Amino acid sequence: MTTSRCSHLPEVLPDCTSSAPSGKTVEDCSSLVNGQPQYVMQVSAKDGQLLSTVVRTLTTQSFNDRPMCRICHEGSTQEDLLSPCECTGTLGTIHRSCLEHWLSSSNTSYCELCHFRFSVERKPRPLVEWLRNPGPQHEKRTLFGDMVCFLFITPLATISGWLCLRGAVDHLHFSSRLEAVGLIALTVALFTIYLFWTLVSFRYHCRLYNEWRRTNQRVILVIPKSANLPSAQQSLLGLHSFKRNSKETIV
C-alpha cells in the first residue's frame, strides 16, 4: 500500500502521484504560498487502486496541538506554562497568574477537575482597596452614604451637645433647674442616638469588610521546580506534535 501527501492552496488541488514502492510511505511535498494556510491532501492506494483521499488544514491542526493555558487559551509567549496538578493533555497546562486569579476568585485551594490540592499562601488585601471597591453596587452606596452622614452628623452632634450643656449651666446660675434638667436630658438623648447609630453602622461595615477580606485574599502559588514546564520545552513539545501529525497515514 502506498500513501502520498501533498500540500496546496485551497483553490488548486492537482493530482499527486508517487513512485515509491509498495508498502512505503512517501514523504510530504508541501508548499506555502504568500503566507496562506497549507492544505494537506492525503492519498492512500493499494495495488494501483485508490482507497481514500483526505484534505485537511495543516496549520490549524498543528496550532491546536500546541500547549496553551486552559483558562485564557493563550500560549507561552507572554508567560511560561505550568503543569501544577494531575490533569493531562490540553487541560494540564496553565499560566501561574491565571491560576492564582482563579483560586482567589473562587476562594478554593484545589483543582476543580482532578481535585489536586495546591500549596498556596494567602495574604489579606489592604483596607484601602476595600474602600475603593467594597463589592456590589448597593454596598458601595451604603458605605458612601454612611461616611457622608458620619462626617456631617459628628460635628453637628458635638456642637448641639455643647450648646445644650452651656444652656443648662446658664439656667442653673439663674435657678432655673427645670430648664437645666431638660437641656441635660436632651443632650444625653442626642449623644445616645448618635452613638447607637455609629456603633450599628460600624459593626455592619466591619462584617462586610471581614467577609470581603476572607473571600478576596491575594493568593501566591507555591510550586516545586519540577512542576514548572519551561517555555523551551513547550516549544519542543509543540514541534514534535506538529511533526507527528504531519506524518499520519490515513487508510
From Swiss-Prot:
Keywords, comma-separated and alphabetical: Cytoplasmic vesicle, Endocytosis, Endosome, Membrane, Metal-binding, Transferase, Transmembrane, Transmembrane helix, Ubl conjugation pathway, Zinc, Zinc-finger
Q: Where are the zinc fingers (RING-CH-type)?
A: 61-121
What EC number(s) does this enzyme carry? 2.3.2.27
Concerning InterPro entries, the annotation shows: Znf_RING, Znf_RING-CH, Znf_RING/FYVE/PHD
- What's in the GO CC field? early endosome membrane; endosome; lysosome
Where are the bilayer-spanning segments?
143-163, 180-200
Q: Spell out the molecular function terms from Gene Ontology.
A: transferase activity; zinc ion binding
Source domain of life: Eukaryota
Instruction: Note the topology in the membrane.
Output: Multi-pass membrane protein
Q: Which pathway does the record list? A: Protein modification; protein ubiquitination
Looking up Pfam families in the UniProt record yields:
RINGv
From the UniProt record, give one GO term of the biological process aspect: endocytosis
**What's its top-level EC category?**
transferase
Residues bound to Zn(2+) 2 are: C85, C87, C111, C114
List positions binding Zn(2+) 1.
C69, C72, H95, C98
> Transcription as a keyword?
no
Q: List the subcellular locations.
A: Cytoplasmic vesicle membrane; Early endosome membrane
User: Which first-to-last residue range defines the signal peptide?
Assistant: none
Main location class: membrane
Q: What chemistry does it catalyse, as a reaction equation?
A: S-ubiquitinyl-[E2 ubiquitin-conjugating enzyme]-L-cysteine + [acceptor protein]-L-lysine = [E2 ubiquitin-conjugating enzyme]-L-cysteine + N(6)-ubiquitinyl-[acceptor protein]-L-lysine
Main role? E3 ubiquitin-protein ligase which may be involved in endosomal trafficking. E3 ubiquitin ligases accept ubiquitin from an E2 ubiquitin-conjugating enzyme in the form of a thioester and then directly transfer the ubiquitin to targeted substrates.
Free-text domain note: The RING-CH-type zinc finger domain is required for E3 ligase activity.
Q: What is this protein called?
A: E3 ubiquitin-protein ligase MARCHF3
Q: Which gene encodes it?
A: marchf3
